């Protein structure tokens, strides 16, 4: 399974800019890139982002989730 950042955003209800932020701070691993430069996410990335989102909903800080 390989999806774009837009599809990842839709699947997890997390804003695209938030996903990019999580990548910048190392909370979400930098994805592979397609030959045209698009980010390409896996099912593992979807699961990780859902975990991060759930942790935030439960009141954990990003540092605690890390």
Q: What does each model-found stretch correspond to?
A:
Residues 26:
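Glycine-centered, phosphate/nucleic-acid-interacting loop/turn motifs that mediate DNA/RNA or nucleotide
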Residues 2-11, 29-35, 40-66:
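Arg/Lys-rich, alpha-helical DNA-contact motif
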Residues 16-18:
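The DNA-contacting recognition helix of HTH DNA-binding domains
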Residues 22:
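Conserved, function-defining core regions and hallmark residues within catalytic/recognition domains
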């Amino acid at each position: 399974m390989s999806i774009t950042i837009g599809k990842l955003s839709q699947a997890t209800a997390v804003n695209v800019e938030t996903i990019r932020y999580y990548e910048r701070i190392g909370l979400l691993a930098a994805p592979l890139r397609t030959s045209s430069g698009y980010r390409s996410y896996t099912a593992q990335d979807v699961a990780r982002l859902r975990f991060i989102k759930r942790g935030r909903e439960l009141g954990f800080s990003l540092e605690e989730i890390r």
